[in-house]
Amino acid sequence: MRDSIPNLVIPPHANDQGLSIGAIEYLRKEYNLMALPKEGFPFMQDDEAPPRPSTKTIKDTAELLAQGKIVGWYQGHGEIGPRALGNRSILMNPFDPQGKDWINAKVKHREPFRPFGASVLEEKVSQYFYWNGPSPYMLYVMDVLEPDRFPPITHADGTCRVNTVSPEQEDYYMLLKEYEKLTGVPVLLNTSLNNGGRPIAGRIADALELYYKTDLDTLVVGDEIKNKS
């Protein structure tokens, strides 16, 4: 479809939230109002975004991921849409053959067959997946070029749902860069910061509840790293 319709756009939030934002944007253009700023939470929340992580925190987190830790990553404002894109994510290295089963059983508490997505540096995506160009919203399924190398992110049919990360996503981009320095691979397993049947963590309190009630090894909220061991 993309070959025959090169300018095809699939909205990343085809739900009530997206309809509301679309209605606002339509009226904005109709009345020549200023563009909406990208910064900020898309709806009201009762706590502030945490401070940004320091370079040291990002490097320390990359080291934990390289060691095989399961990390909750809570940064900035929240995201809307069906996927976690680096602000409300559970992250893990993409190599561990038991990684998918472990997260499904111990953290997500959901069916064992359900696959996980991945994040990759935008400029490196074609080195690991059959894909060229951006895919920032994790809406496309891509063939994994070396499925045996990345078992926890590779579905039974050899594909993975991927979100590409650009320099605009400063902190998450830096995390992938630091992880690449340690492992040689700018790819992380990325799933939403929640467990089965629960919405993605919208507040710091939600992230802390998930951390203490599951087997997450580490939770990074802003510039603070919480470790259980």
Residue positions per predicted region:
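Flexible beta->alpha loop and helix N-cap segments adjacent to enzyme active/binding sites
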Residues: M1-S229
